Amino acid sequence: IIRTSWLYSEYGSNFVKTMRRLGKERGMLKVIFDQVGTPTYAGDLAAAIVHILPQIRPGMKSIYHFSNEGVCSWYDFARAIIEMSGLSCDIRPIESWEYPSKAARPPYSVLNKAKIKKDFGIRIRHWRDALRECIDNLEENNL
């Protein structure tokens, strides 16, 4: 089992694509600053799985964590998305209670990746580097 967090890619609906769309449509966005975690680029998760699969042995059972390296709030993530996308949109930090959600979200959801790195020799890049690749791909394909 591989657990992940804050998953995004060039495809489907996700936070990166939503922030880019809203950043183009609005002059100001309010984004939660008191929930911290680590974004995970789906391409990096897929590459990690491909790296791990040949190393799986019969009877191996464990839970691993995978996300990109580094830590940020949703606000930090949104700012990076808007900046890397070259958009001029004001982003204001708000507290979780100011943005009602159907699901309760933990204030700290950073995953410890030491086990997956040790057991499978995985190197993981920083979330900002992965985000740059995703945004470059989105812009290259006019998404």
List each language-model region with its residue ranges:
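Substrate-binding strand-loop-helix patch
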Residues: 10-11, 35-46, 66-83, 133
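NAD(P)-dependent short-chain dehydrogenase/reductase
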Residues: 1-37, 43-44, 50-51
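Amphipathic terminal alpha-helices
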Residues: 127-143
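Short aromatic/basic micro-patch
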Residues: 1, 37-39, 71, 93, ...
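A hydrophobic C-terminal alpha-helical subdomain
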Residues: 98-119, 124
